Amino acid sequence: GLVGSEMCIRDSVGAGVFKNVAQNRDLILQRTGADLQITRVAVRNLAKKREIEISPEILTTNWRELVADESVQVVVELIGGTDEAFDLVSASLRAKKIVVTGNKALLAEKGQELFALAEQCGVPIYFEAAVAGGIPIIQVLQEGLVANHIRSIHGIINGTCNYVLTRMSQAGLSYADALQEAQEKGYAEADPTLDVSGWDAAHKAIILASLSYGFWIKTEDVHVEGIDQVSIEDIRFAERLGYGVKLLSVIRADADGRVEVRTQPTLLPQSHVLANVNGAFNAIVVNGDIVGETLFYGRGAGQDPTSSSVISDLCEAAATLIYGARHSGFVPHGLYGRSKPINETISRYFVRLTVYDPVSYTHLTLPTKRIV
């Protein structure tokens, strides 16, 4: 069947979706029975030069026009931010349109409200592109591992930070130089604060934790440290001890079912699979009670990998329209779920001291156990 969709875009991912839907339209039709057509596109600036050709007739700057268009069945939100995006997604759900979004900040901060609205309006939200770019980790948790109690998730889920730490480690660059290189190569934004502060990864961790444990984790219950305090000296000392430094997101439940969610620079043994994830790549280790340990690796950002996830969601949305029902996208099941504050969390620490009399510190022993 013909599925009309609209896009509201601000970044290159939207261009990637437009390009790749056109390029692989026949393949998608053969595999899914859905003929995807992007019928309207809302942008902030009509005059802006675009890397792909979009017919001027389908362009507008007013997304409300698109939500009001009865021929449109699916709305794709790729504008980022939380205020206007919240209005757009809410209006689309109220207009009974399926929503596809790649907006992790929006879901982390307003997810509980939006999924309740989706449930009330009887239309789903799809959000594969919100976490880890092209890695289909949302589908894994919602479908592939649905029979498992999730014991823990450990992930490198911010490509900017991983690129910076990799260059510091492998090329000996300072933090500032590595970040500048990441910006020049397009791995980091002009304002990289959200990435380097750890909050981009934390937003993704909130989504993964909420899916895994069935209740929405509040942002204030998440412990976040960025890589902006990591120096080349930290990395060199860690290497002498046999560790690599990664910005790691950790999600796990204790014996009482309290869920800890944190993102911080972490020492990983150099033999650990996550210690060997380099550059802008992402990787996520999910531990389930039935399946055991599983690993997912791939590009966590970029136009094509992220558009792959958006188009996957468009196909799922099309299947919902053609074949019928699906839940809102989030099924609450941890009705008594509680977060675990960082001050009750037990973990090992790395402390680097500058001492004036090394002899008096020789009785200190160095940690040799795994630090996660």
Regions found by a protein language model. Name each.
Residues L2-D11, T362-T368:
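Conserved small/polar residues in nucleotide/adenosyl-binding loops
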Residues S5-E6, R10-R94:
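N-terminal glycine-/serine-/threonine-rich beta1-alpha1-beta2 phosphate-ribose binding loop
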Residues L93-E109:
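ADP-ribose/adenylate-binding Rossmann-like module
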Residues K104-I125:
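Rossmann-fold NAD(P)-binding glycine/threonine-rich loop
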Residues G122, Y126-A188, D195, W199-D200:
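Rossmann-like NAD(P)H-binding beta-loop-alpha module
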Residues D177-N276, F281-A283:
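Substrate-binding/catalytic subdomain of NAD(P)-dependent oxidoreductase enzymes
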Residues N287-A325:
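C-terminal catalytic subdomain
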Residues S309, L314-R370:
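A conserved regulatory-domain signal marking ACT and ACT-like small-molecule sensing domains
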